[in-house]
Protein backbone atom coordinates (compact mmCIF):
# COMPACT_ATOMS: atom_id res chain seq x y z
CA UNK A 1 0.00 0.00 0.00
CA UNK A 2 1.42 3.36 -0.99
CA UNK A 3 2.01 5.90 1.75
CA UNK A 4 -0.23 8.40 -0.06
CA UNK A 5 -3.14 5.97 0.26
CA UNK A 6 -2.42 5.67 3.99
CA UNK A 7 -2.52 9.46 4.26
CA UNK A 8 -5.84 9.47 2.41
CA UNK A 9 -7.19 7.00 4.95
CA UNK A 10 -6.03 9.28 7.76
CA UNK A 11 -7.87 12.19 6.18
CA UNK A 12 -11.03 10.10 6.06
CA UNK A 13 -10.63 9.25 9.75
CA UNK A 14 -9.98 12.88 10.67
CA UNK A 15 -13.09 13.93 8.78
CA UNK A 16 -15.10 11.40 10.78
CA UNK A 17 -13.35 12.21 14.09
CA UNK A 18 -12.00 15.80 14.13
CA UNK A 19 -10.53 15.22 17.62
CA UNK A 20 -8.27 12.43 16.33
CA UNK A 21 -4.54 13.07 16.78
CA UNK A 22 -1.73 10.99 15.28
CA UNK A 23 1.36 11.34 17.40
CA UNK A 24 3.92 9.59 15.22
CA UNK A 25 4.26 7.52 12.08
CA UNK A 26 7.39 5.49 11.47
CA UNK A 27 8.32 3.92 8.10
CA UNK A 28 11.34 2.00 6.97
CA UNK A 29 11.20 2.93 3.29
CA UNK A 30 9.17 5.39 1.28
CA UNK A 31 5.99 3.85 -0.04
CA UNK A 32 5.70 1.20 2.67
CA UNK A 33 2.84 1.05 5.17
CA UNK A 34 3.87 2.44 8.60
CA UNK A 35 5.08 -0.22 11.02
CA UNK A 36 3.81 1.69 14.06
CA UNK A 37 1.09 4.31 14.44
CA UNK A 38 0.62 6.25 17.69
CA UNK A 39 -2.45 8.32 18.30
CA UNK A 40 -5.21 9.42 20.64
CA UNK A 41 -8.85 10.40 20.38
CA UNK A 42 -10.95 12.54 22.68
CA UNK A 43 -14.41 11.00 22.67
CA UNK A 44 -17.68 11.39 24.56
CA UNK A 45 -19.75 8.35 25.51
CA UNK A 46 -23.21 8.71 24.01
CA UNK A 47 -26.11 8.42 26.47
CA UNK A 48 -29.34 7.40 24.76
CA UNK A 49 -31.30 8.50 27.83
CA UNK A 50 -30.64 10.16 31.17
CA UNK A 51 -28.92 7.89 33.69
CA UNK A 52 -29.34 7.78 37.46
CA UNK A 53 -26.29 8.43 39.62
CA UNK A 54 -26.74 7.13 43.17
CA UNK A 55 -24.82 7.15 46.44
CA UNK A 56 -26.69 6.24 49.60
CA UNK A 57 -29.80 8.43 49.71
CA UNK A 58 -28.33 10.91 47.20
CA UNK A 59 -29.28 10.63 43.55
CA UNK A 60 -29.29 12.77 40.43
CA UNK A 61 -30.00 12.51 36.70
CA UNK A 62 -27.06 12.75 34.30
CA UNK A 63 -27.73 13.79 30.70
CA UNK A 64 -24.20 14.25 29.35
CA UNK A 65 -20.70 13.04 30.10
CA UNK A 66 -17.33 14.73 29.87
CA UNK A 67 -14.72 13.85 27.25
CA UNK A 68 -12.73 10.67 27.75
CA UNK A 69 -9.47 9.85 25.94
CA UNK A 70 -8.29 6.65 24.27
CA UNK A 71 -4.59 6.37 23.47
CA UNK A 72 -3.59 3.67 21.01
CA UNK A 73 -0.61 2.18 19.24
CA UNK A 74 -1.01 0.00 16.16
CA UNK A 75 1.75 -2.42 15.14
CA UNK A 76 1.24 -3.58 11.57
CA UNK A 77 3.91 -6.23 11.96
CA UNK A 78 1.74 -8.21 14.42
CA UNK A 79 -1.30 -8.38 12.15
CA UNK A 80 -3.54 -10.49 12.09
CA UNK A 81 -2.97 -11.09 15.85
CA UNK A 82 -5.27 -8.24 16.84
CA UNK A 83 -4.36 -8.51 20.55
CA UNK A 84 -0.73 -7.68 19.73
CA UNK A 85 -1.54 -5.48 16.77
CA UNK A 86 -3.63 -2.94 18.72
CA UNK A 87 -2.56 -1.65 22.16
CA UNK A 88 -5.02 0.71 23.89
CA UNK A 89 -5.35 2.67 27.11
CA UNK A 90 -8.42 4.64 28.19
CA UNK A 91 -7.88 7.82 30.22
CA UNK A 92 -10.87 8.70 32.39
CA UNK A 93 -11.54 10.26 35.80
CA UNK A 94 -14.51 8.03 36.61
CA UNK A 95 -14.12 4.75 34.67
CA UNK A 96 -12.46 2.18 36.95
CA UNK A 97 -9.38 0.14 35.99
CA UNK A 98 -11.43 -3.06 35.74
CA UNK A 99 -14.00 -1.32 33.55
CA UNK A 100 -11.26 -0.01 31.25
CA UNK A 101 -9.89 -3.53 30.80
CA UNK A 102 -13.40 -4.82 30.10
CA UNK A 103 -14.09 -2.14 27.47
CA UNK A 104 -10.76 -2.70 25.70
CA UNK A 105 -11.34 -6.46 25.67
CA UNK A 106 -14.83 -6.07 24.18
CA UNK A 107 -13.58 -3.56 21.58
CA UNK A 108 -10.82 -5.92 20.40
CA UNK A 109 -13.21 -8.87 20.41
CA UNK A 110 -15.57 -6.86 18.18
CA UNK A 111 -12.69 -6.26 15.74
CA UNK A 112 -11.79 -9.95 15.74
CA UNK A 113 -15.39 -10.94 15.03
CA UNK A 114 -16.00 -8.29 12.37
CA UNK A 115 -12.81 -7.69 10.37
CA UNK A 116 -11.75 -10.29 7.81
CA UNK A 117 -8.27 -11.17 9.04
CA UNK A 118 -7.39 -12.83 5.74
CA UNK A 119 -7.11 -9.52 3.92
CA UNK A 120 -4.06 -7.30 4.03
CA UNK A 121 -3.58 -5.07 7.04
CA UNK A 122 -3.44 -2.03 4.79
CA UNK A 123 -7.01 -2.72 3.72
CA UNK A 124 -8.29 -3.35 7.26
CA UNK A 125 -6.50 -0.44 9.02
CA UNK A 126 -9.33 2.08 8.68
CA UNK A 127 -11.99 -0.50 9.56
CA UNK A 128 -10.18 -1.44 12.78
CA UNK A 129 -10.10 2.15 14.07
CA UNK A 130 -13.66 2.92 12.98
CA UNK A 131 -14.92 -0.17 14.84
CA UNK A 132 -12.98 0.69 18.00
CA UNK A 133 -14.02 4.35 18.02
CA UNK A 134 -17.64 3.53 17.23
CA UNK A 135 -17.79 0.96 20.03
CA UNK A 136 -16.33 3.37 22.62
CA UNK A 137 -18.70 6.17 21.65
CA UNK A 138 -21.96 4.32 20.99
CA UNK A 139 -21.89 0.99 22.83
CA UNK A 140 -20.19 1.51 26.19
CA UNK A 141 -22.99 3.37 28.03
CA UNK A 142 -25.06 0.20 28.45
CA UNK A 143 -22.01 -1.53 29.99
CA UNK A 144 -21.06 1.29 32.36
CA UNK A 145 -24.66 2.21 33.31
CA UNK A 146 -26.59 -1.11 33.51
CA UNK A 147 -30.33 -0.46 33.61
CA UNK A 148 -29.52 3.25 33.40
CA UNK A 149 -28.03 3.32 36.91
CA UNK A 150 -24.55 4.00 38.28
CA UNK A 151 -24.04 3.19 41.96
CA UNK A 152 -21.11 5.17 43.38
CA UNK A 153 -18.90 3.56 46.01
CA UNK A 154 -17.74 6.81 47.64
CA UNK A 155 -18.89 10.40 48.12
CA UNK A 156 -15.95 11.55 45.98
CA UNK A 157 -17.23 9.48 43.05
CA UNK A 158 -20.70 10.98 43.40
CA UNK A 159 -19.28 14.52 43.63
CA UNK A 160 -17.24 13.86 40.47
CA UNK A 161 -20.38 12.98 38.51
CA UNK A 162 -22.04 16.08 39.94
CA UNK A 163 -19.13 18.17 38.66
CA UNK A 164 -19.32 16.46 35.25
CA UNK A 165 -23.03 17.25 35.05
CA UNK A 166 -22.47 20.91 35.96
CA UNK A 167 -19.66 21.29 33.40
CA UNK A 168 -21.75 19.65 30.69
CA UNK A 169 -24.63 22.00 31.50
CA UNK A 170 -22.31 25.02 31.31
CA UNK A 171 -21.03 23.93 27.91
CA UNK A 172 -24.56 23.50 26.64
CA UNK A 173 -25.62 26.88 28.03
CA UNK A 174 -22.62 28.69 26.52
CA UNK A 175 -23.65 27.57 23.02
CA UNK A 176 -27.36 28.38 23.35
CA UNK A 177 -29.33 31.64 23.11
CA UNK A 178 -31.36 32.97 26.05
CA UNK A 179 -33.63 35.93 26.80
CA UNK A 180 -32.82 38.19 29.75
CA UNK A 181 -36.06 38.42 31.76
CA UNK A 182 -35.35 42.09 32.60
CA UNK A 183 -34.13 43.78 29.40
CA UNK A 184 -35.60 41.01 27.15
CA UNK A 185 -32.48 41.01 24.97
CA UNK A 186 -31.26 37.69 23.53
CA UNK A 187 -27.66 36.72 24.23
CA UNK A 188 -25.44 33.66 24.07
CA UNK A 189 -25.32 31.67 27.29
CA UNK A 190 -21.69 32.61 27.87
CA UNK A 191 -22.87 36.22 28.38
CA UNK A 192 -25.77 35.22 30.61
CA UNK A 193 -26.16 34.18 34.24
CA UNK A 194 -28.46 31.31 35.12
CA UNK A 195 -30.40 32.12 38.29
CA UNK A 196 -30.46 29.50 41.09
CA UNK A 197 -34.24 29.21 41.09
CA UNK A 198 -35.86 27.25 43.90
CA UNK A 199 -37.76 25.17 41.34
CA UNK A 200 -35.11 23.03 39.64
CA UNK A 201 -37.45 22.40 36.68
CA UNK A 202 -37.32 26.02 35.46
CA UNK A 203 -34.44 27.92 33.90
CA UNK A 204 -34.36 31.70 34.15
CA UNK A 205 -31.50 33.88 32.93
CA UNK A 206 -30.28 37.44 33.33
CA UNK A 207 -27.62 39.17 31.29
CA UNK A 208 -24.63 40.08 33.45
CA UNK A 209 -25.38 43.81 33.33
CA UNK A 210 -29.00 43.42 34.43
CA UNK A 211 -28.06 40.92 37.16
CA UNK A 212 -25.55 43.32 38.72
CA UNK A 213 -27.79 46.39 38.55
CA UNK A 214 -30.91 44.53 39.79
CA UNK A 215 -29.36 42.87 42.85
CA UNK A 216 -27.35 46.00 43.70
CA UNK A 217 -30.51 48.13 43.68
CA UNK A 218 -32.51 45.67 45.81
CA UNK A 219 -29.81 45.55 48.51
CA UNK A 220 -29.20 49.31 48.53
CA UNK A 221 -32.95 49.88 48.93
CA UNK A 222 -33.10 47.30 51.78
CA UNK A 223 -35.61 45.21 49.82
CA UNK A 224 -34.27 41.92 51.12
CA UNK A 225 -37.26 39.79 50.08
CA UNK A 226 -36.75 40.98 46.49
CA UNK A 227 -33.24 39.52 46.27
CA UNK A 228 -34.51 36.54 44.30
CA UNK A 229 -35.37 35.51 40.76
CA UNK A 230 -37.60 38.31 39.41
CA UNK A 231 -39.41 35.82 37.19
CA UNK A 232 -40.33 33.18 39.80
CA UNK A 233 -43.56 33.48 41.79
CA UNK A 234 -42.81 34.65 45.33
CA UNK A 235 -44.46 32.82 48.22
CA UNK A 236 -43.84 34.14 51.71
CA UNK A 237 -42.73 31.50 54.18
CA UNK A 238 -45.50 30.53 56.63
CA UNK A 239 -43.85 29.60 59.91
CA UNK A 240 -47.10 28.32 61.37
CA UNK A 241 -47.14 25.47 58.82
CA UNK A 242 -43.93 23.86 60.10
CA UNK A 243 -44.04 20.77 62.31
CA UNK A 244 -40.26 20.67 62.85
CA UNK A 245 -38.20 23.47 64.40
CA UNK A 246 -35.04 22.40 62.56
CA UNK A 247 -36.79 22.41 59.19
CA UNK A 248 -38.21 25.84 60.03
CA UNK A 249 -34.70 27.13 60.81
CA UNK A 250 -33.30 25.76 57.56
CA UNK A 251 -36.08 27.27 55.45
CA UNK A 252 -36.02 30.64 57.22
CA UNK A 253 -32.25 31.13 57.19
CA UNK A 254 -31.64 29.89 53.63
CA UNK A 255 -31.72 32.83 51.20
CA UNK A 256 -33.50 32.37 47.87
CA UNK A 257 -30.32 33.59 46.18
CA UNK A 258 -27.22 32.06 47.82
CA UNK A 259 -24.54 34.50 48.95
CA UNK A 260 -21.97 32.44 47.03
CA UNK A 261 -23.92 33.23 43.84
CA UNK A 262 -24.13 36.95 44.64
CA UNK A 263 -20.36 37.12 45.17
CA UNK A 264 -19.93 36.29 41.48
CA UNK A 265 -22.27 39.13 40.47
CA UNK A 266 -21.96 42.12 42.83
CA UNK A 267 -19.35 43.79 45.04
CA UNK A 268 -18.08 42.01 48.16
CA UNK A 269 -19.17 44.91 50.39
CA UNK A 270 -22.76 44.64 49.15
CA UNK A 271 -22.72 40.87 49.67
CA UNK A 272 -21.66 41.31 53.29
CA UNK A 273 -24.36 43.94 53.80
CA UNK A 274 -27.00 41.64 52.32
CA UNK A 275 -25.86 38.67 54.41
CA UNK A 276 -26.13 40.69 57.63
CA UNK A 277 -29.52 42.21 56.76
CA UNK A 278 -30.94 38.85 55.69
CA UNK A 279 -29.88 37.15 58.92
CA UNK A 280 -31.18 39.99 61.12
CA UNK A 281 -34.51 40.02 59.30
CA UNK A 282 -34.90 36.24 59.60
CA UNK A 283 -33.92 36.25 63.30
CA UNK A 284 -36.33 39.10 64.08
CA UNK A 285 -39.18 37.24 62.42
CA UNK A 286 -38.30 34.01 64.23
CA UNK A 287 -38.15 35.76 67.61
CA UNK A 288 -41.68 37.10 67.12
CA UNK A 289 -43.06 33.68 66.25
CA UNK A 290 -40.95 31.49 68.57
CA UNK A 291 -40.42 33.26 71.91
CA UNK A 292 -37.86 30.63 72.98
CA UNK A 293 -35.79 30.70 69.76
CA UNK A 294 -33.84 33.97 69.49
CA UNK A 295 -32.21 36.59 71.67
CA UNK A 296 -29.56 39.27 71.13
CA UNK A 297 -26.11 38.68 72.58
CA UNK A 298 -25.49 40.90 75.61
CA UNK A 299 -21.82 41.18 74.67
CA UNK A 300 -21.89 42.14 70.96
CA UNK A 301 -25.64 42.73 70.34
CA UNK A 302 -25.78 40.17 67.50
CA UNK A 303 -28.74 37.87 67.05
CA UNK A 304 -28.27 34.41 68.56
CA UNK A 305 -30.47 31.52 67.48
CA UNK A 306 -31.05 28.25 69.32
CA UNK A 307 -30.31 25.00 67.50
CA UNK A 308 -32.49 23.18 70.04
CA UNK A 309 -35.56 24.90 71.47
CA UNK A 310 -35.37 22.84 74.66
CA UNK A 311 -31.78 23.85 75.48
CA UNK A 312 -31.32 26.96 77.64
CA UNK A 313 -27.62 27.23 76.74
CA UNK A 314 -26.93 29.43 73.70
CA UNK A 315 -23.73 30.56 71.99
CA UNK A 316 -23.15 33.71 69.96
CA UNK A 317 -21.73 32.80 66.55
CA UNK A 318 -19.99 36.16 66.27
CA UNK A 319 -18.18 36.64 69.60
CA UNK A 320 -18.63 33.03 70.85
CA UNK A 321 -20.06 34.17 74.20
CA UNK A 322 -21.90 31.27 75.88
CA UNK A 323 -24.81 32.35 78.06
CA UNK A 324 -28.18 31.35 79.48
CA UNK A 325 -31.20 32.13 77.31
CA UNK A 326 -33.46 32.60 80.35
CA UNK A 327 -31.41 34.90 82.61
CA UNK A 328 -29.00 36.23 79.92
CA UNK A 329 -25.99 35.79 82.22
CA UNK A 330 -22.88 33.77 81.42
CA UNK A 331 -23.69 30.07 81.27
CA UNK A 332 -24.14 28.69 84.78
CA UNK A 333 -24.75 25.02 84.03
CA UNK A 334 -27.94 23.01 83.84
CA UNK A 335 -28.18 22.35 87.58
CA UNK A 336 -28.26 26.01 88.61
CA UNK A 337 -31.82 27.05 87.87
CA UNK A 338 -32.87 30.59 87.03
CA UNK A 339 -36.15 32.32 86.29
CA UNK A 340 -38.14 31.83 83.10
CA UNK A 341 -37.62 34.41 80.39
CA UNK A 342 -40.95 33.69 78.74
CA UNK A 343 -44.14 32.09 80.06
CA UNK A 344 -46.73 30.45 77.86
CA UNK A 345 -50.33 31.58 77.97
CA UNK A 346 -52.92 29.33 79.59
CA UNK A 347 -54.72 28.97 76.24
CA UNK A 348 -51.61 27.42 74.63
CA UNK A 349 -51.04 25.05 77.56
CA UNK A 350 -54.66 23.91 77.63
CA UNK A 351 -54.69 23.41 73.85
CA UNK A 352 -51.56 21.24 74.02
CA UNK A 353 -52.95 19.32 76.98
CA UNK A 354 -56.36 18.53 75.47
CA UNK A 355 -56.02 15.32 73.42
CA UNK A 356 -59.72 15.30 72.55
CA UNK A 357 -59.55 18.61 70.65
CA UNK A 358 -55.93 19.08 69.57
CA UNK A 359 -54.78 16.92 66.64
CA UNK A 360 -51.40 15.22 66.42
CA UNK A 361 -50.30 17.60 63.65
CA UNK A 362 -51.28 20.66 65.68
CA UNK A 363 -49.23 19.37 68.63
CA UNK A 364 -46.18 18.96 66.36
CA UNK A 365 -46.61 22.57 65.20
CA UNK A 366 -46.80 23.78 68.81
CA UNK A 367 -43.64 21.80 69.62
CA UNK A 368 -41.88 23.35 66.61
CA UNK A 369 -42.83 26.81 67.88
CA UNK A 370 -42.20 26.48 71.63
CA UNK A 371 -40.16 23.30 72.11
CA UNK A 372 -41.42 19.95 73.37
CA UNK A 373 -39.60 20.06 76.70
CA UNK A 374 -40.76 23.62 77.38
CA UNK A 375 -44.37 22.61 76.73
CA UNK A 376 -44.09 19.55 78.96
CA UNK A 377 -42.63 21.60 81.82
CA UNK A 378 -45.33 24.24 81.42
CA UNK A 379 -48.02 21.53 81.41
CA UNK A 380 -46.59 19.99 84.59
CA UNK A 381 -46.55 23.40 86.30
CA UNK A 382 -50.08 24.10 85.07
CA UNK A 383 -51.40 20.79 86.41
CA UNK A 384 -49.62 21.31 89.73
CA UNK A 385 -51.21 24.76 90.03
CA UNK A 386 -54.61 23.30 89.22
CA UNK A 387 -54.16 20.70 91.95
CA UNK A 388 -53.23 23.43 94.41
CA UNK A 389 -56.28 25.48 93.43
CA UNK A 390 -58.50 22.48 94.11
CA UNK A 391 -56.81 21.96 97.47
CA UNK A 392 -57.30 25.65 98.36
CA UNK A 393 -61.02 25.53 97.47
CA UNK A 394 -61.59 22.37 99.45
CA UNK A 395 -63.78 22.92 102.50
CA UNK A 396 -61.76 23.27 105.67
CA UNK A 397 -58.56 23.97 103.72
CA UNK A 398 -55.81 25.85 105.54
CA UNK A 399 -54.24 27.00 102.23
CA UNK A 400 -54.52 30.37 100.49
CA UNK A 401 -52.61 32.15 97.69
CA UNK A 402 -50.76 35.39 98.23
CA UNK A 403 -52.65 37.93 96.07
CA UNK A 404 -49.36 39.51 94.96
CA UNK A 405 -46.80 36.76 94.23
CA UNK A 406 -49.32 33.88 94.03
CA UNK A 407 -47.28 31.69 96.38
CA UNK A 408 -49.44 29.25 98.37
CA UNK A 409 -49.44 30.10 102.08
CA UNK A 410 -50.50 27.62 104.76
CA UNK A 411 -52.11 28.79 108.01
CA UNK A 412 -51.12 26.49 110.83
CA UNK A 413 -52.03 28.84 113.69
CA UNK A 414 -53.00 32.43 114.46
CA UNK A 415 -55.70 34.75 113.13
CA UNK A 416 -56.88 35.48 109.59
CA UNK A 417 -54.44 38.36 109.07
CA UNK A 418 -51.75 36.70 106.95
CA UNK A 419 -48.29 37.80 105.88
CA UNK A 420 -46.58 36.21 102.87
CA UNK A 421 -43.15 34.92 103.82
CA UNK A 422 -41.90 35.44 100.24
CA UNK A 423 -42.92 39.01 99.37
CA UNK A 424 -44.14 40.31 102.79
CA UNK A 425 -47.64 41.17 101.54
CA UNK A 426 -50.43 41.41 104.15
CA UNK A 427 -53.75 39.83 103.14
CA UNK A 428 -56.94 38.29 104.49
CA UNK A 429 -56.86 34.50 104.71
CA UNK A 430 -60.66 34.26 104.26
CA UNK A 431 -61.20 36.32 101.08
CA UNK A 432 -57.62 36.97 99.90
CA UNK A 433 -57.96 40.77 99.77
CA UNK A 434 -54.88 42.97 100.37
CA UNK A 435 -54.71 44.60 103.85
CA UNK A 436 -53.47 48.12 104.61
CA UNK A 437 -49.97 47.90 106.16
CA UNK A 438 -50.79 50.92 108.40
CA UNK A 439 -53.90 49.21 109.84
CA UNK A 440 -54.24 45.58 108.69
CA UNK A 441 -57.14 44.94 111.10
CA UNK A 442 -59.44 47.61 109.60
CA UNK A 443 -60.74 45.02 107.12
CA UNK A 444 -62.14 42.95 110.00
CA UNK A 445 -63.68 46.01 111.84
CA UNK A 446 -65.58 47.63 108.96
CA UNK A 447 -69.25 46.70 108.98
CA UNK A 448 -69.48 46.64 105.16
CA UNK A 449 -66.65 44.11 104.92
CA UNK A 450 -67.62 40.51 104.24
CA UNK A 451 -65.05 39.51 106.85
CA UNK A 452 -66.41 41.81 109.59
CA UNK A 453 -65.80 40.25 113.00
CA UNK A 454 -64.12 37.18 111.50
CA UNK A 455 -60.52 37.91 112.51
CA UNK A 456 -60.29 34.78 114.65
CA UNK A 457 -62.67 32.59 112.67
CA UNK A 458 -61.23 29.10 112.14
CA UNK A 459 -58.38 29.76 114.52
CA UNK A 460 -57.47 26.61 116.47
CA UNK A 461 -58.86 26.76 120.02
CA UNK A 462 -61.70 29.19 119.18
CA UNK A 463 -64.28 26.67 117.93
CA UNK A 464 -67.63 26.86 119.74
From Swiss-Prot:
Active site: 415
One of the GO BP terms on file: protein-RNA covalent cross-linking repair
Alphabetic keyword roster: Metal-binding, Repeat, Transferase, Translation regulation, Ubl conjugation pathway, Zinc, Zinc-finger
Pathway terms, separated by semicolons: Protein modification; protein ubiquitination
Annotated catalysed reactions: [E2 ubiquitin-conjugating enzyme]-S-ubiquitinyl-L-cysteine + [acceptor protein]-L-lysine = [E2 ubiquitin-conjugating enzyme]-L-cysteine + [acceptor protein]-N(6)-ubiquitinyl-L-lysine
Pfam families in the cross-refs: IBR
Residues reported in the UniProt entry to bind Zn(2+) 2: 290, 300, 316, 319
InterPro entries membership: E3_UB_ligase_RBR (IPR031127), IBR_dom (IPR002867), Rcat_RBR_RNF14 (IPR047548), TRIAD_supradom (IPR044066), Znf_RING (IPR001841), Znf_RING/FYVE/PHD (IPR013083)
SMART domains per UniProt: IBR, RING
EC number, as in UniProt: 2.3.2.31
Stretches the record annotates as TRIAD supradomain: 176-455
Extra information: Present with 846 molecules/cell in log phase SD medium.
Family from the record: Belongs to the RBR family. RNF14 subfamily.
Domain notes: Members of the RBR family are atypical E3 ligases. They interact with the E2 conjugating enzyme UBE2L3 and function like HECT-type E3 enzymes: they bind E2s via the first RING domain, but require an obligate trans-thiolation step during the ubiquitin transfer, requiring a conserved cysteine residue in the second RING domain.
Protein name, entry field: E3 ubiquitin-protein ligase ITT1
Lineage of the species this protein comes from: Eukaryota, Fungi, Dikarya, Ascomycota, Saccharomycotina
Gene designation: ITT1
Amino acid sequence: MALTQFENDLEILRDMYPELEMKSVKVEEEGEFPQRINGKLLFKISLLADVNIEFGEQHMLLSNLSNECVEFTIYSCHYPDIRRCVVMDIKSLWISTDEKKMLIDKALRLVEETVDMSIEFADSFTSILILIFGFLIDDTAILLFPNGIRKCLTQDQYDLFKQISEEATLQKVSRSNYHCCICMEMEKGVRMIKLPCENANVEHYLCRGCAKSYFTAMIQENRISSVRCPQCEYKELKLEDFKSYKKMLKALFTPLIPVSFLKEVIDTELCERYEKMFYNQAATRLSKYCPYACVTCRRCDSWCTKEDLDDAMIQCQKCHFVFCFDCLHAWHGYNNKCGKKVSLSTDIIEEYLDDTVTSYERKRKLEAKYGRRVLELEVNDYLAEKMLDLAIKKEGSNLQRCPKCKVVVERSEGCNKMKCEVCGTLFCFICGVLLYPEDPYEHFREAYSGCYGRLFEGMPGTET
